[in-house]
From Swiss-Prot:
Pfam families: NUDIX (PF00293). The gene is idi. Binds 1 Mg(2+) ion per subunit. The magnesium ion binds only when substrate is bound. Mn(2+) binds at residues 25, 32, 69, 114, 116. Belongs to the IPP isomerase type 1 family. It catalyses: isopentenyl diphosphate = dimethylallyl diphosphate. Its main location: cytoplasm. Pathway: Isoprenoid biosynthesis; dimethylallyl diphosphate biosynthesis; dimethylallyl diphosphate from isopentenyl diphosphate: step 1/1. Its cofactor is Mg(2+); Mn(2+). Catalyzes the 1,3-allylic rearrangement of the homoallylic substrate isopentenyl (IPP) to its highly electrophilic allylic isomer, dimethylallyl diphosphate (DMAPP). One of its GO terms (biological process) is isoprenoid biosynthetic process. The active site is at residues 67, 116. This is Isopentenyl-diphosphate Delta-isomerase.
Length: 182
């Protein structure tokens, strides 16, 4: 398991310090910087992952491909690439911003709060997956249209950040562009 921190933010999104990642996520989680990424394969299918049961927040929940926290001195794009390698063992194309101003707060059934400024990215995989079981307990390659129908019909079956991202009209449009074969 990687030791990481989160970059704390004030209400205007300005960095104010750091805190160890595990300690940062509590019932009173402070606002911090994160990222979320949606990955597509060469067939235009979306990678949906199920969070490992050892995760502190939303264990066992289906979500978009990979999420994480940039480290000090690291761009969001560099953080996406790092976490894709760590969680999924996969190489990707340069991440593209699809929802740059996404911000949310949500509480999981155990009372753990996510409180994040969380730019959203999409990319294509360029290598085979090598799943890290400490991070991901299951995964599926799915047609984006099927996933979006599932989110619309049963939002409770997915992470709240995935649902909020997928219900944003502009983000949906940008995600749909990744289903086109290149």
């Amino acid at each position: 398991m990687q030791t990481e921190h989160v970059i704390l933010l004030n209400a205007q999104g300005v960095p104010t310090g750091t805190l160890e990642k595990y300690a940062a996520h509590t019932a009173d989680t402070l606002l911090h910087l994160a990222f979320s990424s949606w990955l597509f394969n060469a067939k235009g299918q979306l990678l949906v992952t199920r969070r490992a049961l050892s995760k502190k927040a939303w264990p066992g929940v289906w979500t978009n491909s990979v999420c994480g926290h940039p480290q000090l001195g690291e761009s969001n794009e560099e953080a996406v690439i790092r976490r894709c390698r760590y969680e999924l063992g996969v190489e990707i194309t340069p991440p593209e911003s699809i929802y740059p101003d996404f911000r949310y707060r949500a509480t999981d059934p155990n009372g753990i709060v996510e409180n994040e400024v969380c730019p959203v990215f999409a990319a294509r995989t360029t290598s085979a997956l090598q799943i890290n079981d400490d991070e991901v307990m299951d995964y599926q390659w799915c047609d984006l249209a099927d996933v979006l129908r599932g989110i619309d019909a049963t939002p409770w079956a997915f992470s709240p950040w995935m649902v909020m991202q997928a219900t944003n009209r502009e983000a949906r449009k940008r995600l749909s562009a990744f289903t086109q074969l290149k």
